[in-house]
Regions:
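Short conserved loop adjoining the S-adenosyl-L-methionine
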Residues: 96-101, 117
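A short glycine-rich, Lys/Arg-flanked "PGG" loop and its adjoining helix->strand segment in the class I
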Residues: 120-135
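Short, glycine-/aromatic-enriched active-site segment of Class I SAM-dependent methyltransferases
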Residues: 142-161
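Short alpha-helix
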Residues: 162-178
Length: 205
C-alpha cells in the first residue's frame, strides 16, 4: 500500500512503513520546498513525517501530531532511527492543535480527518495554524449517502469509513473555515458501492 510513494519511502524504518494506515500519499502532488514548515495531522508511526523531512531539508521543519502516546513514542523512535533532526512529534488532538497560529506552510493529513466527529473544528484549526498563503494537502475518504446503519457501525468507524462525509460536505467545510482554492486533485474508487470515494483534497489559505 505504499505504491503512491514512488521511491520516496526507500530506506525509511520498517516500523514506520508497516504501521502506515493511510489511504494515499498526501505529499504526492505537494509543492513542498526546502525550508518549509510541514504539519502532519495524525502522524501515526511517522511515514509521512519522514517523507516530508526529506523534502524540507535541514532548513525546514516537520511537526507531527498524534493523539495516542503509543504512536507519538513510535514516531519519535522512527524519526531518531532515520536520523532526522528537523522533526518534532507532539501529542494532541486535531480539533485543538498544539501548534502556534500562522506558523506552518503546509498541513498534510493521511486518512484521518474523516474520523473526527467535529470536522468544522479541525478545518478551523487548519486555517488557524497555516501562514498566509499556506497550503493544505489531504488524502481522505469521502462517501456518498452512507446509510445510517453503517455510520453507526463502530467496526467500520475504526476502519476509516463511518465517520466520513460526502465530498461536497467536506469541501464546504474547508471553505467555511476560510480556505480558498479548494479542489479535488485525484479520486480513487474504494470498496463497495456505498463506499465509493477517496479523494486527495487540496486547498490553500
Amino acid at each position: 500500500h505504499h505504491d503512491g510513494y514512488a521511491g520516496e519511502v526507500d530506506g525509511l524504518p520498517a516500523d514506520a512503513l508497516d504501521n502506515s494506515f493511510g489511504c494515499g500519499n498526501p505529499l504526492a502532488f505537494a509543492g513542498v520546498s526546502p525550508g518549509d514548515v510541514v504539519l502532519d495531522l495524525g502522524c501515526g508511526a511517522g511515514v509521512d513525517l519522514l517523507v516530508a523531512a526529506r523534502k524540507v531539508g535541514a532548513a525546514g521543519r516537520v511537526i507531527g501530531v498524534d493523539m495516542t502516546a503509543e504512536m507519538v513514542e513510535r514516531a519519535r523512535a522512527n524519526v531518531a532511527r532515520a536520523g532526522f533532526a528537523n522533526v518534532e512529534v507532539r501529542q494532541g488532538i486535531i480539533e485543538e492543535l498544539p501548534v502556534e497560529s500562522g506558523s506552518v506552510d503546509w498541513v498534510i493529513s493521511n486518512c484521518l480527518i474523516n474520523l473526527s466527529p467535529e470536522k468544522d473544528r479541525v478545518f478551523a484549526e487548519i486555517a488557524r495554524v497555516l501562514k498566509p498563503g499556506g497550503r493544505m494537502r489531504v488524502s481522505d475518504i469521502v462517501v456518498d449517502d452512507l446509510p445510517e446503519a453503517l455510520r453507526a457501525d463502530m467496526v467500520l468507524y475504526a476502519s476509516c469509513v463511518a465517520g466520513a462525509v460526502s465530498e461536497a460536505e467536506y469541501l464546504d467545510g474547508l471553505r467555511r473555515a476560510g480556505l480558498v482554492d479548494v479542489a479535488v486533485v485525484e479520486r480513487y474508487p474504494y470498496g463497495t458501492e456505498v463506499l465509493p470515494g477517496i479523494g486527495d483534497i487540496a486547498d490553500r489559505v
